[in-house]
C-alpha cells in the first residue's frame, strides 16, 4: 500500500486517541471555508476519512467513527452526504453544492469503481480540461468539475496537478493499486487539517 501526499497533511496522534481508533495509520479531515456573501455567514464543506492497517474497517470500528465525524460537520455541507468503504479505507463527505447540484454526489467513482474521490473546491479551468478529455474519448456522466479531476488523474496520475487552476483539496483512492493520493491547491486556499 502506498500513500502519496502532495500537500501539507498533519496526522494527529491526539486526534487518533480522542476517537479511540485502534491501529489507525491515517486520519484525513478536511475542513473548507466558503463565504456566503448574501447571508453574511460562513458555510463550510468538508470530508473525513481514515485508513487503517487492518484489512477490514469494521474490525477497527472505522466506519462508525467516520459516520460520527461526518455527522459533526453537517453544518459545513448541508446539501448532501456520502460514504465509501473499501478494505482498509473509509471516506465520508459533506457537500455544499455549487456546480451540478444533482450530479456532484460524493465520494465519486470513475473507471468502473477503480478510483474513488472526495473533493472540495473549484477548478476554474474545468471546462477546458473537460473538452480535452472529451477529445480523448472520455464520456462524462455529470457536469461536475469533480469528474474532470478524476478523468485527469486517470490520465496523468500525480502530474494532473499541473493542469488545475483553482482552489481545491481532494483525496483519490485507487482500489486496483491500493494507493491514496492527497492534494491541495498550491497556495493552500483549501488546506488539510
Where do the protein language model's features map onto the residues?
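Compositionally biased, low-complexity intrinsically disordered regions
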Residues: 5-6, 23-26
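Polybasic, lysine-rich low-complexity intrinsically disordered segments
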Residues: 17-23
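Short, Lys/Arg-enriched N-terminal segments with co-localized hydrophobic residues
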Residues: 27-43
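Exposed, low-complexity/repetitive linear segments and helix-based recognition motifs
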Residues: 10, 19, 33-34, 142
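Low-acidity, Ser/Thr- and Arg-rich intrinsically disordered low-complexity segments
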Residues: 2-8, 12-15
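Accessible peptide chain termini
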Residues: 1-2, 44
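N-terminus-centric sequence/structural signature that marks the extreme N-terminus
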Residues: 39-193
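A periodicity- and composition-biased signal for non-globular, repetitive helical segments
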Residues: 12, 23-24, 36
Amino acid at each position: 500500500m502506498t500513500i502519496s501526499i502532495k500537500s501539507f497533511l498533519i496526522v494527529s496522534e491526539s486526534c487518533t486517541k480522542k476517537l479511540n481508533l485502534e491501529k489507525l495509520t491515517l486520519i484525513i479531515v478536511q475542513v473548507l471555508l466558503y463565504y456566503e456573501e448574501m447571508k453574511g455567514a460562513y458555510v463550510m464543506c468538508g470530508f473525513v476519512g481514515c485508513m487503517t492497517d487492518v484489512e477490514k474497517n469494521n474490525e477497527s470500528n472505522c466506519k462508525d467513527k467516520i459516520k460520527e465525524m461526518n455527522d459533526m460537520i453537517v453544518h459545513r455541507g448541508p446539501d448532501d452526504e456520502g460514504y465509501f468503504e473499501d478494505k482498509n479505507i473509509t471516506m465520508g463527505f459533506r457537500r455544499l453544492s455549487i456546480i451540478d447540484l444533482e450530479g456532484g454526489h460524493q465520494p465519486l467513482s470513475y473507471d468502473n469503481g477503480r478510483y474513488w474521490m472526495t473533493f472540495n473546491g473549484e477548478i476554474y479551468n474545468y471546462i477546458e480540461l473537460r473538452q480535452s478529455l472529451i477529445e480523448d474519448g472520455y464520456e462524462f456522466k455529470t457536469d461536475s468539475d469533480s469528474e474532470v479531476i478524476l478523468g485527469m488523474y486517470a490520465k496523468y496520475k500525480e502530474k494532473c496537478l499541473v493542469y488545475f487552476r483553482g482552489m481545491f483539496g481532494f483525496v483519490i483512492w485507487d482500489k486496483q493499486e491500493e494507493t491514496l493520493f492527497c492534494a491541495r491547491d498550491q497556495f493552500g486556499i483549501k488546506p488539510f487539517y
